[in-house]
Amino acid sequence: MAGALENARKEIKRISLEDHNENEYGQIYSVSGPVVVAENMVGCAMYELVKVGHHNLVGEVIRLDGDKATIQVYEETAGVTVGDPVLRTGKPLSVELGPGLMETIYDGIQRPLKAIKEQSQSIYIPRGVDAPALSREVKWAFKPGKLGVGDHISGGDIFGSIFENSLLEDHKILLPPRARGTITWIAPAGEYTVDETVLEVEFDGKKYSYSMFHTWPVRVPRPVTEKLSADYPLLTGQRVLDSLFPCVQGGTTCIPGAFGCGKTVISQSLSKYSNSDAIIYVGCGERGNEMAEVLMEFPELFTEVNGRKEPIMKRTTLVANTSNMPVAAREASIYTGITLAEYFRDQGKNVSMIADSSSRWAEALREISGRLGEMPADQGFPAYLGAKLASFYERAGKAVALGSPDRVGSVSIVAAVSPAGGDFSDPVTTSTLGITQVFWGLDKKLAQRKHFPSINTSVSYSKYTNVLNKYYDSNYPEFPVLRDRIKEILSNAEELEQVVQLVGKSALSDKDKIVLDVATLIKEDFLQQNGYSTYDAFCPIWKTYDMMKAFVSYFDEAQKSVSNGANWAVLSEATGDVKHAVSSSKFFEPSRGEREVHAEFEKLFASIQERFAESTD
C-alpha cells in the first residue's frame, strides 16, 4: 500500500499534463463522499491504484463501466472538483513486506503514523502525505543464507536473515513468491537499508535485482505449498477459554458482544499473553482511545523468553484505523492486516491476527455499497457480505510455506463483532458464525454483574475440542474428561436454578444442592479472572488443569459422601476449610514455576480426600 504508493509517487511527483501521456490519466466525472467516478479510463483494471485530483489522493478502482471507472478514495475528498485529473499507476493496492514491521503503527493503507507525525508535526494525517511503510534510513545486519552464486532459487526461498529485535531474532528474507532464476550475485554479510540490492538473479537471459523487502497485493492470498490441519492449542491465559472453548493455532474465532462486555479486553489479553510468535492487531473502526490504550500499555508489558524479560511490543504490529479515519480505508485495513500476518506465517511463525471489530468493517462495506447504488440485503448490508467475510477468514490456517527450507507456520484470526444492542441475530454475527469454528459469546448480564471475562458458557462453543484430544492425551491425559464434567455441572445447575426459583432450594435433594454449590464455586473462582492481578492476569494451561482437577475431585468426594448417607448441610459446614482451599487455588502464583505450584495442588488433592473421609466417619 504505502509501499506501492511510495513507489508510484516517486514516478508520479505531481500530476501535470506535461509529465504524462494523455492515455495515462482520466478526468473526474462525479464525486459522492469517498466514491469518485472518473471518465476516459479505457484500459484501467479492477482494483488498480489511482491518484485522484491535484492532491494525489490515493484511490482504488472498484467498478468499470465503459470508459468510466468508479473509485473508492482512501482520503478525505473535500475540495476535489469535476474535471480534476485522475492518474493510473498500473499496479494494485499493495503492502511492503520486510524488516521493520514490528513495533510499528500503521493506518489502514500501511502509512506509518509515527513517521507522518514527525514529517507533518500534526496529530492528524494531512491529505496526500507521503511516507514509506518501511524506513529507508535504518540499516539492518544482513546475513546471507546457504544459497550461493550459481544456485537456482524460486519463490519463497530464504536467501538471508536479519536480527530485527530480541523477540524476533531471525527475520528471514524471502524471495517474492512469483520470482525465480539463478543467483548471479548475493550481498556479503553487512549492514544494508531495506531498499539496497542484496540479490541479483538471472532468468531467461534477463537480470533481476531484489532488496530485503518486496510488495504484495493485499487482496490476493499469499500462496502456500500445502494446507495442514491445525492441532496445537492457541493458549490465551484465560481459564474459561483454554479449558471449555479452546482455539487452535491456525483457527478462526468470533467474539460477539454488546458494548461494555469486554471484547477489547479479551482481544488485548490475547495479544499480551497468547503463545503466538507475532501479533497483528487491527483496530478497525473502533474508538481512538482504545488504540491509545494499546499503545500506552503494550510497551510496559513484558513476556519472558529464555529467562529474559522483553516488552511484547517487539512482537506486535498495529494497524490503527479509528472511527474518524476515512471509511474506505477501514475496508482495506482488514486486508492489510491479514497480508502482514501471512508474511510472518511464510517465515514459519505462528501469528495471531486480532480484528477489532469486523462489524465496523461490514458497516464500511454497507456505506460504499449504498453509494454505488447496489441492491441492499438484510439490514442494508450488501448481498455479498457473507462471501467477503468467508474470503477473509479463509486466509487463516496452518500451512507449509512456499520455498525451501521447509517451514510450517499458521495464521489465527480472532475477530470481535459488535452487534447493535448485543443482538446475535444481526447479519454480520450470523454470517461470521457460519464461517468461524469457535464462538466466545459475551453476555451483557454477566458484564453488569462484574463477572469477567463475561463468557456465556451455555451459548459459546468450540469445534476444535476433538482435534485437540491428541495434544491433551500426550500432555494432560484427563483434560477432556474434566472439561466435560465441568460443562455437565454447569448445565445441570442451570436447569436446577429454574426449579429453585419455583420451589426454593430446600425442596432439592442433597445431590442437587451439591451441584448448585459446586457450580457457584466454579463460576466465581474458576470462570472469573482478575486481569489486573499478578496471580490471575495470565493462567498457564498446567494451572488450569490442576484447578479443574481440584473442583471436580471436591464435587466427586461430596457426592460420594452424600451417597453413603451423609447430610450435605452438616458436611459442607464441616468441610468449609476444604471448600475455601479449593476456591483459593486461583491465588497460587504461576510465576513460582510449574513444579512448586503442582506440589501445592497435590497437597490440596490429598487434603480434600482426607477431610471428606474424616467428616463421613
Swiss-Prot record:
It comes from Eremothecium gossypii (strain ATCC 10895 / CBS 109.51 / FGSC 9923 / NRRL Y-1056) (Yeast). Gene3D superfamilies: 2.40.30.20, 2.40.50.100, Bovine Mitochondrial F1-atpase, Atp Synthase Beta Chain, Chain D, domain 3 (1.10.1140.10), P-loop containing nucleotide triphosphate hydrolases (3.40.50.300). It is a peripheral membrane protein. It catalyses: ATP + H2O + 4 H(+)(in) = ADP + phosphate + 5 H(+)(out). This is V-type proton ATPase catalytic subunit A. PROSITE patterns: ATPASE_ALPHA_BETA (PS00152). InterPro entries: ATP-synt_VA_C, ATP-synth_a_Xtn, ATP_synth_asu-like_sf, ATPase_a/bsu_AS, ATPase_F1/V1/A1_a/bsu_N, ATPase_F1/V1/A1_a/bsu_N_sf, ATPase_F1/V1/A1_a/bsu_nucl-bd, ATPase_F1/V1_b/a_C. It is an enzyme of class 7 (translocase). GO terms for biological process: ATP metabolic process; intracellular arginine homeostasis; intracellular histidine homeostasis; intracellular lysine homeostasis; proton transmembrane transport; vacuolar acidification. HAMAP family: ATP_synth_A_arch (MF_00309). It is found in: Vacuole membrane. The gene is VMA1. Pfam families: ATP-synt_ab, ATP-synt_ab_N, ATP-synt_ab_Xtn, ATP-synt_VA_C. GO terms for molecular function: ATP binding; ATP hydrolysis activity; proton-transporting ATPase activity, rotational mechanism. Keywords: ATP-binding, Hydrogen ion transport, Ion transport, Membrane, Nucleotide-binding, Translocase, Transport, Vacuole.
